[in-house]
């Protein structure tokens, strides 16, 4: 116990708890996509940004602790809009769901959250998890009891019928009345959004009732887009945000689906249509087969007991033989076409990763998604960063509080050595993380 207390004393003393801080010298990327500011100065009082300028234009009061960001890119804390805290990269969902539910709340989900935060993710959306555990972990993070990003949680997946053995985190609906009831239960419990899957197996009346009831409770609805009919019905019902680059190995989205998306994005009066393509896991899978060194990166061990680490390692010893990914090499050539179809149709893209699924570790997924967007899909780095900062905050309705480095907003800020606009992959080594004005990594 004495050694443990000494350890925590050392850790705590290594962080700064001064209420007034100045980040000085780095190149500031504000999250809006504006021209970066060199030799920047950011003033923070408590958890709020109180000044943004340059060394020449903004004076630093004597009472402020100066933190040098010279030679660094400084940007808003990242968002990941599609994570699964309840899983940590194990390849066998059925086994995991049977073995670890009792550890979800106190071990596994906190571990996932901590890994995300250390990777520079200061806000994240958890889509599909056990209801009370999701809310409890979110609230413990918000109260400062455990480290992690500010979490926005959906609670259970809503679908026509839960898969056998998944009833803890998948809820079925049986008719319009039951659909509304399930959404009211989730709303009353305090979820932040609603997550649908397999909505093409529902009746349109059930789907429409879900969306209508969610919107009555000011909850956005996020839905899968694996199959054309999921998209068609979802657009008709008013889904706010689609997930994944779907349609398996089909070479492109059907013309009628793209036309429906065009019609939806043309309606400025109801706001943007959002899409989270979660493309990196599909694109990089074949590289993992040839070189799986990232599986040996110990960053994903953070917070997990040795027994679970060993269990995960054993499950992914042969990445080329995992049933989950057998179609992935065939899907890879279709990804860029589909990604560009969606962009050309006017959807607003969001950075999300599906982190937690087999071999997709919370500590590594977000930067990899950004890297594929920029270096494979051809997205401008400033636009990619905006999709990981401003746009997620806008979608979740908190853009007045977070998402950009602006006066009056919460001080969620990260910094990395070097120029991320030239080398976006530098985000794999985030040097500095500030959440709500507190330095949590330095």
Predicted regions located by residue number:
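Bacterial Sec-dependent N-terminal signal peptides
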Residues: 1-20
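Divalent metal-coordination and catalytic microenvironments
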Residues: 26, 42, 47, 71, ...
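Histidine-rich, glycine-flanked metal-binding segment
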Residues: 28, 32-75
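Metal-associated gating/positioning segment near the N- to mid-region
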Residues: 72-140, 164, 205, 226-244
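Acidic/histidine-rich helix-loop elements
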Residues: 85-104, 158-177, 246-252, 321-327
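Divalent metal-dependent hydrolysis catalytic cores, especially in the metallo-beta-lactamase
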Residues: 109-132, 149-156, 188-199, 220, ...
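Active-site core of metal-dependent hydrolases
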Residues: 196-331, 357, 377-378, 396, ...
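His/Asp/Glu-enriched, well-ordered alpha-helical/loop segment
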Residues: 216, 319-323, 332-419
